[in-house]
Amino acid sequence: MTEMITYLTELNIAITIFFGAYLLIFRKDSNFATRRVYLLFAMVASFVIPLLRFNIATPAGTLNTTLITLPEVILQGSATSTAQHTTSLTEILLVCYIAVSTFFVGKLLAGLTRIVIQSATSEKKWLNGVRVHISKELHASSFFSLIFIDPAQSNNEDLNHILEHETFHARLGHSLDRLMAEVLLVISWFNPVVWMLRKAIVVNHEYQADNRVIEHGTDQVSYQLTILNQYIGSASISNQFSNQIKNRINMINKNYKKGSSWKGLMLFPVSIALVFFMACGNEEAMNNQNAEEASNEHVQKQTEEEIFYVVEQMPQWPGEEDL
């Protein structure tokens, strides 16, 4: 129980620090490939770093530990009820955490099941040399090599742009990033930074796919009109959708800077700092645990010794026998 809480705490500290560095470094950067590598590394490192354990050896003779065992004191009354209350509160929080995590697991599995069913039952066609699944249930999307699209919802020019956009999603393997983000969400749904990270991954995928479409030779103005038609045709444009359209179009008009890939080197100092921080915390916890175990062994050894209730030989003083 304690180890799980420690792992979750360190995982969320790591992901928060990584994402904070991402906002500082990559907020206005247009090198989407480097941004993607950073976000992927941040997720993987956040899972792995808390698992690292280091044992920094202490030179012999420099550490002198003295264990003092005090008699056991049993507290009664209000102290006992307080301990029981604390235990029950911990159990309630654990049950709530597991319940919400189970909900997100079910939601993830339901989404994957829906994709599997649609891929098995939908009509397959070849459009512009790409094998697609015709589906009215799923909006234009991709999952690894599967591409879902509904030709009836778009004209020919928009359909070509949408198909090209989803094809680049599939080729770049964006579904792997999304799946990792969903797993992280299942574990750390209580951390708002994880929700922000998940959104940042999705947004960066859109920017990267848009950039590839433009680099492939698609007319920039007509492609931007396709983006507008997609949002206008789907629903009434809310403030959130309006910002998404604005940001995507701004990124399309922004020059792609390949030279900014050096920013990915920031992964190393952030990772080293986190490893050192986690290692120091783990070392202190291990030392405390070892000291506690040693103390328990000492107490157990004392309790296992023979206890005398009757004096076998009475003490005598010099000259007492002559009395």
Region spans (language model):
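Hydrophobic topogenic segments
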Residues: 2-294
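Charge-biased low-complexity segments
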Residues: 285-323
